[in-house]
Amino acid sequence: MTAATHTKAQVLAAALPWLKQLHGKIVVVKYGGNAMTDDTLKAAFAADMVFLRNCGVHPVVVHGGGPQISAMLKRLGIPGDFRGGFRVTTPEVLDVARMVLFGQVGRELVGLINAHGPYAVGITGEDAHLFTAVRRDVMVDGVATDIGLVGDVEHVNTEAVRDLIAAGRIPVVSTIAPDANGVVHNINADTAAAALAAALSAEKLLMLTDIEGLYTDWPDRNSLVSQINTADLTELLPTLEAGMVPKIEACLRAVTEGVPSAHVIDGRVEHCVLVELFTDEGTGTKVVNP
């Protein structure tokens, strides 16, 4: 046996405690950032989801599509804007977001996963009443600001997702959803992932980002934290960069509503999901209750 083979065996053996802990459990993964634009990282992420499924873990993927939406808006000559970390969504922007999220980003990820077998099924928040949206404002410099057809999750109906899990499938969720009156809204994927994780009683929520984890004093690289509780994180929230706010709010929401832990992980690391779930080191910041 070669040294490399022995090392592989040790890695697999070391993963056993985590495999036992997660067997039969649901893990919600928010897929976004560089992991969804780099071909190598995209393929690695898809393989990670199939690995989890074949180890008896139930992955549920919720994906964003910000860069792809921005690219299509530019291509179509439609202006786009962000406020408070959220995209301002006019009816024209919503049409593009709806098309790109389900018709492009979701289709690509489903295809990558299904290259390994008949696993992934794409759905949106509109399907089987998965999400009911409620229009939301965001705080910009302390002022409540309207950002158009952007919703929060008012209600989650998990039946369709649970049916897919029971059938051995990997749900791939696009975050477009109607409100109670049928008006369709764009829901931030971080927000939707947290709501779905809580409703499914998931064991973990993983948030892929383009940084190593949570910095308490950005840009000081020494301020990276490996674990933080919800009380400390709530105090820290007003000081964070706008782009991190939806992700941290999502972690707080998930853990507060019963998910044992939420993890902000570095999606630029190949196989980051497996590293976070099945090794001592992990790749980012773990959020837990005090």
UniProtKB/Swiss-Prot annotation:
Pathway: Amino-acid biosynthesis; L-arginine biosynthesis; N(2)-acetyl-L-ornithine from L-glutamate: step 2/4. Gene3D superfamilies: Acetylglutamate kinase-like. One of its GO terms (cellular component) is cytoplasm. The record marks K30, K247 as: Transition state stabilizer. Substrate binds at G65, G66, R87, N186. The keyword Membrane does not apply. SUPFAM superfamilies: Carbamate kinase-like. It is found in: Cytoplasm. One of its GO terms (biological process) is arginine biosynthetic process via ornithine. Keywords: Amino-acid biosynthesis, Arginine biosynthesis, ATP-binding, Cytoplasm, Kinase, Nucleotide-binding, Transferase. It catalyses: N-acetyl-L-glutamate + ATP = N-acetyl-L-glutamyl 5-phosphate + ADP. Its EC number is 2.7.2.8. CDD domains: AAK_NAGK-C (cd04250). InterPro entries: AceGlu_kinase-like_sf, AcgluKinase_fam, ArgB, Asp/Glu/Uridylate_kinase, Glu/AcGlu_kinase, NAGK-C. Pfam families: AA_kinase. It comes from the Bacteria. Its main location: cytoplasm. GO terms for molecular function: acetylglutamate kinase activity; ATP binding. HAMAP family: ArgB. Catalyzes the ATP-dependent phosphorylation of N-acetyl-L-glutamate. Belongs to the acetylglutamate kinase family. ArgB subfamily. This is Acetylglutamate kinase. It comes from Mycobacterium sp. (strain JLS). The lineage of its organism: Bacteria, Bacillati, Actinomycetota, Actinomycetes, Mycobacteriales. The gene is argB.
